[in-house]
A protein has these predicted regions:
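Structured cytosolic domains appended to multi-pass membrane proteins
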Residues: 48-49
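A generic, lipid-embedded transmembrane alpha helix
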Residues: 52-58, 302-304
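Recognition helices and adjacent regulatory flanks at domain boundaries
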Residues: 1-3
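Secretory-pathway extracellular proteins and peptide precursors enriched for disulfide-bonded cysteines
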Residues: 8, 41-42
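Iron-sulfur cluster-binding cysteine motifs and their immediate structural context
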Residues: 17-38, 44-45, 55-83
């Protein structure tokens, strides 16, 4: 991690700790006030506790063009993106995705789709082009192949996520051990799941000075809960399959209902967040993270779009090609989860739990 980034972050937090004008805005400032020095672990914890509401920038008397140049939202955004690379495993992949961003995500989706398409064409070419009145996905990609591919990828991704979040949690708790209480855990989960701090003191997020909007929070909700519904759909389908109830499932079945609702959320949420990003004051964000953000949002959107199209056209000739493209996009999304913007939700939830165990404990 860059020494200059840590030194600049420490300087800003020291100035803010002396001023304390913004102490009521969000959890960052009460947590900051408990510290007199700011090492790497402190800075990365505070950075992930920040929800980038932007209020402190416009309230700060030392913000640019003041010679101190205090722009805390941007500096914490830079530290956040550095924390993803710091804690991820294996570290080399984190650096690659951070540097390439959007290009890496889209290229990976295209390559995986092309490889799966070529494999299907070589081993079962007829299934790609013929109508499939039953909508049987396994006639295109055998059940064992699909389970093996995604089972292996899921195991790798889960291992990477667990290692990363464990590293963050362990380093964030470098001070004397804090007991994990049910009350603190419940408050942290509540704050994370409701996005309670994705606004300042109960008012909507700033998109620019004196410009407020609740949409950033709502689009986050659409994205997050859309993802959860799609995950629930896949989980229910896995249970059905284990019970011998094979896909495809009826439009009125639970997996399809959950997946459709989640898919709609994953169309509206990422599209809305992409628009919101372009409307926000550039002073609030780190330009270096644009590629990671946009890659994640694009993969979520394309996963949902291809999945919904596959549902509608599953008994048509296009089903085979659509299935391969959808699976390639989903696999690209999965592979990039531990190294992109997805982890910000996990690190922020961990930071909120720590905050509720310590500062509010």
């Amino acid at each position: 991690m860059q020494i200059e980034l840590l030194q600049r972050g420490e300087h800003m937090m020291t100035v803010c700790n002396a001023c304390r004008y913004c102490e009521q805005y969000c959890p960052v400032f009460p947590a900051m006030e408990e510290r007199r020095t700011f090492g790497k672990a402190d800075l990365l914890y505070l950075a992930n506790l920040c929800h980038n509401c932007g209020e402190c920038l416009y309230a700060c008397q030392y913000a640019p063009p003041h010679e101190f140049g205090i722009d805390l939202p941007r500096k914490l955004a830079e530290l956040r993106i550095a924390s993803y690379e710091e804690y991820c495993w294996p570290a080399s992949l984190g650096g690659a995705f951070r540097q390439q961003g959007l290009a890496a995500g889209t290229a990976l989706a295209a390559v995986l789709s092309a490889v799966m398409l070529a494999s299907a064409w070589l081993f079962n070419p007829g299934a790609l082009w013929r109508p499939n009145p039953g909508g049987d996905f396994y006639s295109v990609v055998p059940h064992g192949v699909m389970v093996g591919l995604f089972g292996g990828v899921s195991l790798f991704v889960l291992s990477s996520l667990v290692i990363g979040i464990s590293r963050f949690w362990r380093e964030a708790h470098h001070e004397p051990a804090v007991s994990l209480t049910a009350a603190g855990l419940a408050r942290g989960l509540r704050d994370g799941l409701t996005l309670r701090h994705l606004h300042s003191s109960g008012v909507p997020c700033t998109t620019g000075e004196d410009v407020r909007s609740p949409w950033r929070r709502w689009f986050h909700h659409g994205t997050f809960y859309g993802f959860l519904l799609c995950f629930a759909s896949t989980s229910v389908a896995a249970v059905y399959d284990a019970l011998g109830w094979s896909a495809p499932y009826a439009y009125t079945s639970l997996p399809v209902i959950l997946g459709t609702a989640g898919g709609i959320g994953l169309l509206i949420g990422p599209a809305g967040l992409m628009v919101q990003r372009r409307r926000r004051d550039p002073a609030l964000t780190d330009p270096a993270q644009n590629g990671l953000d946009e890659s994640f949002l694009l993969l979520l959107f394309l996963t949902s779009l291809s999945g919904l199209l596959l549902l509608v056209l599953r008994d048509r000739t296009a089903m085979g090609i659509l299935l391969i493209v959808h699976l390639g996009i989903v696999m690209a999304l999965f592979v990039t989860l531990p190294y992109g913007k997805f982890v910000h939700g996990l690190y922020r939830l961990a930071a909120l739990i720590k905050y509720n165990l310590t500062t509010r404990g």
